[in-house]
Amino acid sequence: MAAAAECDVVMAATEPELLDDQEAKREAETFKEQGNAYYAKKDYNEAYNYYTKAIDMCPKNASYYGNRAATLMMLGRFREALGDAQQSVRLDDSFVRGRLREGKCHLSLGNAMAACRSFQRALELDHKNAQAQQEFKNANAVMEYEKIAETDFEKRDFRKVVFCMDRALEFAPACHRFKILKAECLAMLGRYPEAQSVASDILRMDSTNADALYVRGLCLYYEDCIEKAVQFFVQALRMAPDHEKACIACRNAKALKAKKEDGNKAFKEGNYKLAYELYTEALGIDPNNIKTNAKLYCNRGTVNSKLRKLDDAIEDCTNAVKLDDTYIKAYLRRAQCYMDTEQYEEAVRDYEKVYQTEKTKEHKQLLKSAQLELKKSKRRDYYKILGVDKNASEDEIKKAYRKRALMHHPDRHSGASAEVQKEEEKKFKEVGEAFTILSDPKKKTRYDSGQDLDEEGTNMGDFDPNNIFKAFFGGPGGFSFEASGPGNFFFQFG
């Protein structure tokens, strides 16, 4: 900020004046010198006061306005500084430093095109001025960043817009427009604390800034604080009734809130079909609201689970965690659906994710239960082998054994190929194992609880299914198969 860092020490040439005018000029010059001393000590507030006194004594002196502009720039008061710089060049059109300060203020405020005109005028006055040459390049760079950002915003490439605005703000630190665009893109990227910080800084300087109010509301809206968001949108519209973005966001926020609440009410009343429809309608309102939509997907997944549409419920919960991979409730809901559909590996994976995030006793127990079911699912399913459910009675288990044992007995398949005989022998043995376990209350209890039966002293490796078969059908000679043509058998009981 070379133009701001130096104060002018030479007064502009004036025509001969009256004695009292000469006295005023001497007094003004004294004030200016005092201002310069404070400026050199970086006491810019005092420097400002003395330059103001100098201006009051000699309001037609361009350099005094130039000096006060430099001081205001150091204080970050660029809009006031611009007024002084413009006044300095109105008083002296050939005042190069005045043009540089005018351009620097324009650039700091984000008016790059106006800055270019000021720097061009400075170069016309002094074509070798290195500062004017560099600042002219800087102003053109800002215009280019602004142009790229506008295109990328339309493409929804928000990261690139943030990059361009960061570069532009290096030259235009007081430009609210650039800061607001950056904040809006940060919000679209889910970087809400950063976006809120930028918007809040602007609101501290200008509480009526509609764009900053809109961005604050947008952050709250995307964080699912919809009621608070609406308040900011309404305030932004009060400041700028034609603020299109705030109007759309306010409308979407109100619609989302209403649909979600109606869906929740229908769910609580047990009207799952209506709840499903309302959550679906809510999901169509604003695809950019990631957090709210994640909750809506999870809610709809819960509805689908109530309707026993478990695959649809799993899909909804998957969509929820895609939008918000920290959403514990969605992982829990999906894990339960996986359990209900006997997809135990997937359930274990979800419960592990939950437990790693929140190590509670409840989550630990859910994980252990899923791991147990997974272990059980990898053993032989004796209920499936016999074709009975887990609540089958003793008589039902016996009837099932009788049917399956006769179906797979090796003698029945003595005329089949070696491959078929081998498969039927295997099935016959499995049927015997299943009956041995499920017909014994203690063994059945251990099996149902997921205990390893071999570890409990029941070694099925030496098991002979024929012993069970003979005992069940009355011992040796009590039962025989007799072939009567292809595929027909007669059963003889003793």
Curated annotation (Swiss-Prot):
Q: Which keywords has UniProt assigned to this entry? A: Acetylation, Chaperone, Cytoplasm, Cytoskeleton, Nucleus, Phosphoprotein, Repeat, TPR repeat
Tell me yes or no: is Acetylation among this UniProt entry's keywords. Answer: yes
* The protein's role, per its UniProt record: Acts as a co-chaperone regulating the molecular chaperones HSP70 and HSP90 in folding of steroid receptors, such as the glucocorticoid receptor and the progesterone receptor. Proposed to act as a recycling chaperone by facilitating the return of chaperone substrates to early stages of chaperoning if further folding is required. In vitro, induces ATP-independent dissociation of HSP90 but not of HSP70 from the chaperone-substrate complexes. Recruits NR1I3 to the cytoplasm.
Cross-referenced InterPro entries, in alphabetical order? DnaJ_domain, J_dom_sf, TPR-like_helical_dom_sf, TPR_rpt
Q: Where is the J domain?
A: 381-451
Which residues carry the post-translational modification N-acetylalanine, per the record? 2
Q: Which CDD domains match?
A: DnaJ
**Protein species of origin:** Pongo abelii (Sumatran orangutan)
Highest taxon above the source species: Eukaryota
- From the UniProt record, report the name of the gene that encodes this protein: DNAJC7
A single GO cellular-component term on record: nucleus
Which PROSITE patterns does the record match to this protein? Answer: DNAJ_2 (PS50076), TPR (PS50005), TPR_REGION (PS50293)
Query: What is the protein name for this chain?
Result: DnaJ homolog subfamily C member 7
